[in-house]
Amino acid sequence: MFFSRGSLGTVEFAFTKRDGGRSEGNFASLNLAASTAPGLGDEFSDDPSVVKRNRSILAAAFDVPHIVAMTQVHGSDVVFVDGATVEAPVADAMITDQPDLGLLVRAADCTPVVLADPQARLIGVVHAGREGLVKGVVTAAVREMRRRGATRIQAWVGPRACGLCYEVPAEMADAVAAVVPEARSTTSWGTPALDVGRGVIAQLKAEAVHVTDIGEGVCTIEDEAFFSYRRQGKASGRQGAIVVLRPAGDRE
Ligand SMILES: [Zn+2]
C-alpha cells in the first residue's frame, strides 16, 4: 500500500503505490481516482464504488474519518480546507489546519508534494505536472501557507516520471525550460525531455523550503509498482499522497 510513510511532529504522511486495494485490471489495485479519463466511456474508468472502498482502506490505515481529494485541473489555485468542505474542491493544491482530516493528492506520472509546518500547524498537498510546474502551483501553495503563518515549511516530493523517460516535443521542452530551467532533460535515448520533479524541487528550494525527495531514483513509468499514464494509457489508475495533522499535544 505504502511506498513510503513518515511523520514529523504531529504531521503524518504517506505516498502510496499500486498494491493493497480492491480495483482490478489496469486499475489494480489501490486506485484512488474514479474518473481518470472523463468522457471516454466506462472502459477507461474504474468502478466508483470500488475506488470509494480503496479510499476507505487508506482512511482506515491513517485512522481518519474523512479524506478530502481535489478535482485536479492542472492549474495553480490553492484551496484552504476549513473542515466544512468534504466535497472535492477544484484545485491542484490545498492546505488545512484541521486535525485528523486527510488531504489526498493523486497522480500517475505527475509529481505529488506534501507540505507541512508542524509548529504553525499547517499542512498541504500539491499536484504538479508539466502545466502546474509552469504555472507555479508549488510556489503558490508555499506562499499561501506563509500568508497563513507558516515559517518553517518542509516538503516531501513523491514518485513521478523521471527525466530520462518523460519525452516531450522540443518546442514544449523549450517552453517549460524558459520558465523553469532546471526541468530541462534528455531521455535515455537522446531526445528532448522534462524532469518535472527536478523543476518542482528547484521551485521549493527557491522559496527556502526544506525538501526531502522521497521519489529520488524511482520512476512511475519504469516501475510497475506504480500507476503510469505514459505506460498504461488513458485507462490508468492513480496513486497518491496523504497528509494528516494530528491534534496538538497528542504526541511530540
Ligand atoms: Zn524513468
Model-derived regions, located:
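Active-site microenvironment for binding and transforming phosphate-containing groups
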Residues: 1-252
